[in-house]
């Protein structure tokens, strides 16, 4: 916890990209120049009304925003306690929040004259969203994906290929998201002249954590306005799943200076934090440097990154965005572990009560929201970010339950 209370969370990051003691730019000398170029281009674009207008137009007419807030009445009755509201990011084009960010970064890539984009992906949703905007803008697209994740996300792999992207399997390390990000960074160093790296989460060196946050902040801005319009007040609590944490920071950001809104992040506790088979970086990690920024990481006593586990490919990452680390240390947000079993139970309960198949990532937030609702009075409002749809996870769920499709 910070010794001094934070009076304005919007004062972060500072000019060097730091969120308190987290964030920054810890990279090889060869990347300093490209990152400075990217930072300058982004700072210029975000002040350009024509760029903002083009981005907003795409969000409305291509993505289909605004996404609605849905009152899950049957789920709320089944659970007892507070009313559970769902921010329906699963209804966006491509089926998740990821396209909010890829559209913004792809427009920036075109503005910078880049002709090739690369991306990393875990669950495949960021890869699909990157391939989608690349197709729309006529850009070459390569997506790095861990071989383990390719096996458990075959549908999204094929979707990327249908959209014209090349999917590069990564077999190093644990062959998951961390390793895909490593390979994408190596590609960018080699091909920086014509290549734009669209990072999919609020990690990486500055300016990525703030840039990805800003492009996803539409989720929170919409939610805040919708809550005031539909309910006449802000929610009592908000919840989102956290791997790197892009969907979560997108929701959280609009509420950071509202002390009456409690903020909760759901990390992947896997088989249980005590087992060591999890991906709960804040709950069980320690400060360290990963992928160019200082944050909480899952590592051994020598500081070496250790393997993680989650049923959800998109949460299977040994770090977390530096702003989340900062929010945790400041006490503004609380991060809790949700196990595979809890996420699976929430997936089924939401399907049976509301007819909605949530992504396994999002199901962690649904599980957390259910726990919160049970502790709150009936007139309390819990807003859960349903960050993606679960079509991509049907085979994983069936296999876990011993069914062959």
Curated annotation (Swiss-Prot):
It is an enzyme of class 4 (lyase). One of its GO terms (cellular component) is cytoplasm. Its EC number is 4.2.1.20. The modification N6-(pyridoxal phosphate)lysine is found at residue 98. Keywords: Amino-acid biosynthesis, Aromatic amino acid biosynthesis, Lyase, Pyridoxal phosphate, Tryptophan biosynthesis. Its cofactor is pyridoxal 5'-phosphate. The keyword Amino-acid biosynthesis applies. GO terms for molecular function: tryptophan synthase activity. It catalyses: (1S,2R)-1-C-(indol-3-yl)glycerol 3-phosphate + L-serine = D-glyceraldehyde 3-phosphate + L-tryptophan + H2O. The beta subunit is responsible for the synthesis of L-tryptophan from indole and L-serine. NCBIfam families: trpB. Belongs to the TrpB family. Tetramer of two alpha and two beta chains. This is Tryptophan synthase beta chain. The gene is trpB.
């Amino acid at each position: 916890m910070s010794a001094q209370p934070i009076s304005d969370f919007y004062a972060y990051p500072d000019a060097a990209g730091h969120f308190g003691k987290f964030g920054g730019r810890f990279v090889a000398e060869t990347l300093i120049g490209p990152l400075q170029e990217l930072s300058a281009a982004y700072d210029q674009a975000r002040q350009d009304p024509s760029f903002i207008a083009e981005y907003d137009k795409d969000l409305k007419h291509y993505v289909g925003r605004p996404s609605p807030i849905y009152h899950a009445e049957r789920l709320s009755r089944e659970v007892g306690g507070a009313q559970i509201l769902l921010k329906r990011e699963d209804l966006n084009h491509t089926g998740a929040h990821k396209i909010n960010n890829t559209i913004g970064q792809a427009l920036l890539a075109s503005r910078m004259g880049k002709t090739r984009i690369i991306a990393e992906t875990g669950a495949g949703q960021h890869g699909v969203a990157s391939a989608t905007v690349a197709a729309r803008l006529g850009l070459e697209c390569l997506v790095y994906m861990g071989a383990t994740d390719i096996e458990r996300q075959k549908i999204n792999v094929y979707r990327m290929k249908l959209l014209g992207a090349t999917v590069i399997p990564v077999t190093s390390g644990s062959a998951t998201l961390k390793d895909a990000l490593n390979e994408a960074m190596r590609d960018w160093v080699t091909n920086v002249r014509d290549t734009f790296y669209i990072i999919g989460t609020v990690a990486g060196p500055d300016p990525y954590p703030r840039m990805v946050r800003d492009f996803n902040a539409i989720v929170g801005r919409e939610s805040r306005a919708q809550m005031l319009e539909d309910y006449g007040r802000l929610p009592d609590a908000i919840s989102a799943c956290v791997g790197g944490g892009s969907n979560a920071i997108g929701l959280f950001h609009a509420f950071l200076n509202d002390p009456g809104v409690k903020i909760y992040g759901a990390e992947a506790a896997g088989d249980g934090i005590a087992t060591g088979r999890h991906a709960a970086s804040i709950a069980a990690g320690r400060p360290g440097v990963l992928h160019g920024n200082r944050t909480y990481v899952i590592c051994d006593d020598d500081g070496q990154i250790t393997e993680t586990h989650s049923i959800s490919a998109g949460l299977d990452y040994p770090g977390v965005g530096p702003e989340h680390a900062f929010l945790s240390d400041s006490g503004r947000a609380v991060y809790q572990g949700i196990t595979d079993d809890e996420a699976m139970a929430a997936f089924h309960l939401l399907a049976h009560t509301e007819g909605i198949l949530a992504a396994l990532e999002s199901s962690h937030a649904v599980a957390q929201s259910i726990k919160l609702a049970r502790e709150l009075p009936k007139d309390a409002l819990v807003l859960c970010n349903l960050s993606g749809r679960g079509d991509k996870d049907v085979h994983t769920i069936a296999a876990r339950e011993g069914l062959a499709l």
